[in-house]
Amino acid sequence: MILLRSALFNIAFFGWTILLLLAGLPLLLAQRRAIHAIGALWARGTLLLLRALVGIRLEVRGALAPGARLVAAKHQSALDTMLFYLLAHDVAYVMKQELAAIPIYGLFALHQRMILVDRKAGASALKKLVADASAARGEGRQIVIFPQGTRTPPGAPASAHPYQPGIAALQHALRMPTTPVALNSGLCWGRRSFVKRPGRIVVEFLPEIPAALQRAEFMRRLEESIESATARLEREAGDAARS
C-alpha cells in the first residue's frame, strides 16, 4: 500500500511541479516577488498532496521574526528546499550553482537572485557567497543555508557530514543573528527515496544565536543546537510510531 501511495504522490508531485514551472514562465518578466509567490504555491500544493496521498502532516514549532537574518537549517529531504517559501520572509536560499543549470527551474532561481555557490571554486566561492548574502541582507531578506551542505539521513552523526565553513563566513562577515532550525523530514521523505512514509514532519525554530560570537564558539553552538534538537525530534517520531 505504501508503494502505491508513494507512486501516486510522485506522479502528482512531478506533474504539479512541471505545471507550475510552465505556468510561471510569464512571471520571469515580472518582479522577483512574483516568483516567490509561485514557490509558496508549490510548497502548499506539495504539502496538500503529501497529506492526501501519503498521510504526511507538517507541524511547525515557533516562527521567524521579521527582518534580515541567517537561518541555518538541518537538511534531510527535498521537501526542505521548498518549505521556507512558506516559513521565511522573502527567502534567499543558498544553493549549489549546478541547480541553476536545471531547465526552467534555474531561470526561476536566477530571477529570484538566490545565492549560488560554486563548490569547486574554493576561496573565491566564499567571497562571492558573502557578497551575494550582503546584497540579500540589504534587501531585508532572510537567508536560508543548510550548513552541512547536503541532505543527511536521520540518525547520521554530524561527523559523517561536517558543518561547512560557509555559515561561519557569513556570520563573521555579516554579523547577523542566526536562527537554527531542527527537523525530521527525512523520516518520511528520505534522500532520493521513492517511498514516502506516513507520519508527522516537525520543523522547529530554535533559540537565536547572537551575532557577536567568535567563529569557533558560533560553530559549536550552532551544531550542538541543531543536532540535539534534531535527535529529539527523531526520538519523538519513533515513540509516536510505537505507541
Description of each model-found segment:
Residues 66-74, 140-146:
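Pre-Walker A (Motif I) flank of P-loop NTPase domains
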Residues 60, 71, 93-94, 203-205:
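Generic preference for hydrophobic
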Residues 63, 108-109, 170:
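Structural alpha-helical scaffold elements that stabilize or flank donor/cofactor-binding regions
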Residues 1-70:
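Membrane-anchoring hydrophobic helices of lipid-metabolizing enzymes
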Residues 48, 82, 168-169:
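Active-site phosphate/pyrophosphate- and oxyanion-stabilizing loops and adjacent acidic/basic residues
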Residues 21-39, 51-53, 69-122:
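Catalytic core of membrane glycerolipid acyltransferases/transacylases, capturing the structured
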Residues 63-64, 122, 184:
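Residue-level "edge-of-site" marker
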Residues 126-243:
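Non-catalytic C-terminal accessory region of glycerolipid acyltransferases
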